[in-house]
UniProtKB/Swiss-Prot annotation:
GO terms for biological process: peptide catabolic process; proteolysis. The lineage of its organism: Bacteria, Bacillati, Bacillota, Bacilli, Lactobacillales. The record marks Y375 as: Transition state stabilizer. PANTHER family: PROTEASE M1 ZINC METALLOPROTEASE (PTHR11533), PUROMYCIN-SENSITIVE AMINOPEPTIDASE-RELATED (PTHR11533:SF174). CDD domains: M1_APN-Q_like (cd09601). This is Aminopeptidase N. Its EC number is 3.4.11.2. Monomer. It is found in: Cytoplasm. Pfam families: ERAP1_C (PF11838), Peptidase_M1 (PF01433), Peptidase_M1_N (PF17900).
Length: 846
């Protein structure tokens, strides 16, 4: 049922908010006055978990009704027009990282608490009565009093104006949506700097971390703001930009205007323990949130069905920004590895959501944050659009968009209009097929009787209903003489031989630089030509060959055995991008390989041979001056070499562990997870698991925590696994924000999978209570869908989750997971014998 839009009866202009918060009792006392235009004599405001003592309108006490089911308070004001409605109420801090909530941490054994906020998507109503809809923009005058102790500070969207008897009064905000209001208070340390234009930038964290961990995020934040001000040709509109790392945080980060909050692992970088990958990850997260300060905050989607306007764009701009700031990182390679790969896999399942999807009820909003679609696919579409328009027109169109719609709300067509006005191209016509339709096409390229035939149809992994969808496909070819777009089902280009001669006889490939959202099925001589030139191709094209052939095999268009046969073509590759593509393909092939089988021995041998040259080249030790690509590649090479049972690698891993066993954090960060994993696999020691868990609890290094949790999940000891699962109930050991990741590490390993699955089913009610509404909640639906591969597990999954299909927040994820498991089971059944044979044959020949 469609939810009511409360802005239709009341349009807010200003909120005056006073909050008195007591950390010890976890109680909130609130006073809020909302000034705006009443369009009816009875108006409603969003409120959830608020207990009202008094409501006034036109300075007179008035009647009200609390409607818990619709999360509303209905107020009878008696007349229409401009009015101030005031509320006095009480509430409690939440325990699910939504609304106003506590974050817990320790410093030198002393337990401490921060208070922070998370109001996106519709959780401002848990803190104060409001029109909690993105279109209902207003200004906010915030005042906060709390049980202040020595060393405490408070930060918010705007600078603090004054402090009166412990009441912190902040400057009025600019006009913005309710979900962007934020504040954090507690004992925080910080470092500050300024941009060239004078914006004050600060990085904040608890004293559980070294101050040095603030240097990298502060530098990236300053340079990112400077980049965006120049690229957007629009000044950053606030006096400051605060970046706060919170010990407990539901998602990765939140773009609160001027007061951005982060999960600690997404912001802090310890210079003594940081890998190049962790730096790149943190930098792109910060750049993503800062992109939102314009696209999402200054200009905001009108309703949640255009959430992609926020997330797709910011996900694209984080790479544009980092490519400009750190060109040696080659971040577009990372884009292909992560975003493109994620989008292509998820978007190939029938029933997947489109980028733009109708939202009728707030409970559905959580399903929109599908990272593979709204973030990854959406950003891939923005990359495609930027290439089609050219960067100059793309940037100029954005500048026009911000100028035209600043402090307002938009729909997707408003962006297309601005880009079209600058470029002269029909952007809406080009983009609608991509944004409004689910899925993507496979473009088949073949030569028949000297005619090149290019055709498109929707690509499915697993069963899918072909509805005849067509896309405006940018061919982005390396040849001249071909059309720019494939908009029809098929195009035929005669005179192929002459066309090839005109292009110097080089092999034809499409989708240059992997910038458009489709894959290619090269038939016959076209594939043979491409593979014959593989060594001279660009790295991204080599990656695409691996990517596309893997997906075609996954869909049953070709056999995985055919994919195994092309692996020897990639034994000499030194590129991080190509070797990552190789690693991803190997992970897919592991589905077919039974543990402790003859095929596994052959597969291990094959993997070892594929990575042997890079193992000899890179070894275990970082070399001064080596490229970011080599530093990133080392971990992949070592992991695959150890999988191959290479004796030298296993000996060296054990030696490194022995050297650092008294201080595991001192293992060089780029090889640390490899060493930690190997020691558990080699010893299968319950005592070592205990050591890892004790280290996990004590360390404040968030990346190190992840590594330790991944390593302990490799244990093959039923008693220890049961203890690990039981520890998820203790927030002093595993924080609620980390349960999903820790549990998945156990679920994905064959030995512990049954126990992890049984634990989920037995603890579903408590998970729902603890994490319901949290962005990690549906991971407990999605992760089994990404993992299970047998008919028995499919039946168990359906038996457990099909009764939960009425839950709108989980419905799509359940349906998608069932289709994914079904397809995986069918794939293994149909191709296992051929794949096993191909692995054995190639391993002997290589």
């Amino acid at each position: 049922m469609a939810v009511k839009r409360l802005i239709e009866t009341f349009v807010p202009e200003n909120y005056k908010i006073f909050l008195d918060i007591d950390r010890k009792t976890k109680k909130i006392k609130g006073q809020v006055a909302i000034t705006g235009e009443a369009k009816d004599t009875v108006v409603a405001f969003h409120a959830k978990g608020l207990h009202f003592n008094k409501v006034r309108a036109f300075s007179v006490d008035t009647n009200f009704i609390e409607n818990e089911e619709d999360e509303e308070i209905v107020v009878k004001i008696g007349e229409t027009g401009r009015v101030t409605v005031s509320f006095e109420y009480e509430a409690e801090l939440t325990d699910n990282m939504m609304g106003i909530y506590p974050s817990y941490y320790e410093v030198n054994g002393e337990k401490k608490m921060l208070i922070g906020t998370q109001f996106e998507s519709h959780f401002a109503r848990q803190a104060f009565p409001s029109i909690d809809e993105p279109e209902a923009k207003a200004t906010f005058d915030l005042s906060v009093k709390f049980d202040e102790e020595e060393g405490d500070i408070i930060v918010s969207n705007m600078p603090e104006l004054l402090n009166i008897n412990g009441i912190h009064v902040f400057e009025r905000t600019v006009k913005m949506s309710s979900y962007l209001l934020a504040f954090v208070f507690g004992e925080l340390q910080y470092k500050k700097g300024k941009t060239k234009s004078g914006v004050e930038v600060g990085a904040f964290a608890t004293k559980a971390h070294s101050q040095a961990a603030l240097d990298f995020p502060l530098d990236i934040a300053i340079r990112s703001i400077e980049f965006y001000e120049d690229y957007y040709q629009t000044p950053y509109p606030l006096p400051h930009s605060w970046h706060i790392a919170l010990p407990d945080f539901s998602s990765g980060a939140m773009e609160n205007w001027g007061c951005i909050t982060y999960r600690e692992v997404c912001m802090l970088v310890d210079p003594e323990n940081a890998t190049i990958q962790s730096k790149q990850y943190v930098a792109t997260v910060i750049a993503h949130e800062l992109a939102h300060q314009w696209f999402g905050d200054l200009v905001t989607m009108q309703w949640w069905d255009d959430l992609w306007l926020n997330e797709s764009f910011a996900n694209n701009m984080e790479y544009v920004c980092m490519d400009a700031l750190e060109p040696s990182w080659n971040v577009w390679e990372s884009f292909s590895i992560s975003e493109a790969n994620m989008a292509l896999n998820r978007d190939a399942t029938d029933g997947v959501q489109s980028v733009h999807v109708e939202v009728t009820h707030p409970d559905e909003i959580g399903t929109l944050f599908d990272p593979a679609i709204v973030y990854a696919k959406g950003s891939r579409l923005m990359v495609m659009l930027r290439k089609w328009l050219g960067d100059e027109d793309f940037a100029a169109g954005l500048a026009l968009y911000f100028k035209r719609h600043q402090y307002g709300n938009t729909v997707g067509d408003n962006l297309w209009d601005a880009l079209a006005e600058v470029s002269g191209k029909d952007v809406a016509a080009f983009m609608h097929s991509w944004v409004n339709q689910p899925g993507y096409p496979v473009v088949t390229a073949e030569v028949v009787d000297d005619t090149l035939i290019l055709s498109q149809k929707q690509f499915f992994v697993g069963e899918g209903v072909d509805k005849g969808r067509l896309w405006n496909v940018p061919l982005n070819t390396n040849w001249t003489g071909l059309p720019d777009l494939l908009s029809s089902e098929k195009v035929e280009i005669p005179g192929f031989a002459a066309l090839k001669t005109k292009n110097n006889g080089k092999a034809l490939f499409l989708n240059d630089a992997n910038m458009a959202h489709y894959i290619i099925d090269y038939k016959g001589a076209l594939l043979t030509d491409l593979l014959s030139e593989v060594e001279s191709l660009e790295n991204v094209t080599k990656f695409q060959i691996l990517q596309d052939r893997k997906l075609l095999a996954k869909a049953g268009v070709i056999s995985y055995a055919d994919v195994v046969n092309i692996l020897p073509s990639f034994t000499n590759e030194e590129s991080y991008l190509v070797n990552t593509g190789l690693s991803q393909l190997i992970s897919e092939l592991e589905l077919f390989v039974d543990e402790d089988s003859e095929t596994e021995k052959a597969f291990q041998s094959l993997v070892g041979k594929l990575f042997a040259k890079n193992y000899a080249r890179l070894g275990w030790d970082k070399v001064a001056g080596e490229s970011a690509g080599d530093e990133s590649l080392r971990g992949i090479v070592l992991s695959k070499t150890l999988y191959s049972e290479n004796a030298d690698a296993k000996t060296k891993a054990s030696q490194i562990f022995a050297t650092h066993k008294e201080n595991l954090a001192s293992i060089p960060a780029d090889i640390r997870p490899i060493v930690l994993n190997n020691e558990i696999k080699t010893t299968n020691s319950a005592e070592l698991v205990k050591t890892y868990r004790e280290t996990y609890i004590k360390t404040s290094l968030q990346e190190f925590k992840r590594e330790l949790e991944g390593a302990v999940a490799l244990i093959k000891d039923e008693k220890v696994i049961a203890e690990l699962l039981e520890s998820f109930k203790n927030a002093d050991i595993v924080k609620p924000q980390d349960i999903a990741f820790s549990w998945f590490y156990l679920l994905r390993n064959d030995f512990s999978q049954d126990a992890a699955w049984a634990w989920e089913k037995a603890n579903w009610a408590s998970l729902e209570e603890k994490l319901g509404g949290d962005m990690s909640y549906d991971k407990f639906v999605i992760y089994p869908g990404n993992t299970f591969k047998t008919a028995d597990k499919l039946a168990e999954y359906k038996a457990f989750f099909e009764p939960k299909l009425e839950n709108q927040g989980l419905k799509r994820s359940i349906e998608m997971a069932i289709k994914q498991i079904t397809a995986r089971v069918a794939l293994i059944d149909s191709q296992k014998a051929a794949v096993d044979k191909a692995i054995t044959d190639i391993a002997e020949k290589l």
